[in-house]
């Protein structure tokens, strides 16, 4: 009986072992349209301040034209700017101009999303180690967050990370607060310059005592500078300074939350504990 030809043993096809992939890097939600990122209440407040001045002048019978005085503008507004230029170092003045927009468009606040991001990082660190976070460093847009994550990947001690980030936090907070105080100082100088403008106006009136027909108009024009000084200080400069300080405080609290989250990851805390700890910053 003929034997069947020898056949090479069949081997099952090779199947690649599935390698678990790390979760995709956190990406913040798309930036909302400009008008949605605006602080509507601040915008309404500034507009109401103008309406209050113009409307009050009209209701009092003074008219809109009485609010304009080139001499008062030069003495009060330009004088205030001149005093601030002498008062403030150039870097602080430039910073003040750059953060003035925060009154209408404050920095985006995504603290809830940031908590989720840090919790995701803690899960990656528990499964893959701190080096598993290295691919995520380049994706960070916030320099403070990027620096902290890089130090975490580099394996620095938790206290070293805290010390370095707190120095950055304190330095940035000091710079921004000094910039906000520029508007606070303008609110101090403007009323005083308004009084100076009124005195100049009264001096001009005293020179025309021989012509009684000019006295009423001259006295009214003299007090326009006082209006400029008091109104600009209490309706614009001082509220702007207070709003900027509030925004700066919020940014500092957000960075404190980042520091606590990164330290917790470095210490190997449970992600649930980290989430509970950071939730306290959201209240």
Could you tell me what each predicted segment is?
Residues 10:
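Detector for the Zn2+-coordinating histidines of canonical Cys2His2
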Residues 37, 44-47, 51-64, 168-247:
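Helix-termination/interfacial motifs at the ends of transmembrane alpha-helices
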Residues 13-15:
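Intrinsic low-complexity, disordered N-terminal segments enriched in polar/charged/small residues
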Residues 34-35, 41, 52-179, 251-283:
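Large intracellular
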Residues 20-37:
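Short, Lys/Arg-enriched N-terminal segments with co-localized hydrophobic residues
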